[in-house]
Amino acid sequence: MTDTRPLLLIDVDGPLNAHGGPYSGGDAPDGYVMHRLHNGSFTDEHGRPWAQGGLRIWLNPAHGPMLLALADRCELAWCTAWRETANEFIGPLIGLPELPVVPLPDGWVTLNDHIWKLPGVEEYAAGRAVAWFDDEFTPADDEWAEKRTADGLATLLVHIDPVHGIRQCDADRVGEWASTLAAVSISGEPAVGTPLRVGDRAP
């Protein structure tokens, strides 16, 4: 049976792996735990070895339950440069089950000022409503979301501050959006015109 829930696409670096720790040289935000990952295949996939002592990432164990609380209203899927390895290394550390993975283009080449993942998302999410956590959206992506919504496919881009990662207020926005879509679907009213995009970063 076709899943009628909207998709919820989840990036790793920034939304889950806070940039405040690994990329700025500073401390991770409160609630985050540092992990060291070891995987010999990283050299083959990305052309360089893991950092000595393992790759350090910062994850918040609260993110797993926070995302799972949305699973009754959204179908969760990875949309990340980690690709399938998100299921191997990220999900288990925060309590997520194995999730579908959006096939993404090779490399990180932007197209017409859009986020590099957009071609993969357009193909994967064809015909479905989409909410998306990422920290690399551009103004062109916001325009894409607005047009997609106006064309009848509700689209919510949640801009995540990579220093703090996904906050409860971000998850609440997705939950409210998905509940609105469900109510609209039951009533039979068109979804176009409801508030469906979050373009501002959380305070």
What is each residue range found by the language model?
Residues 2-110:
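Alpha-helical substrate-recognition element adjacent to the catalytic core
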Residues 85-203:
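C-terminal cap/substrate-recognition subdomain and adjoining C-terminal extension
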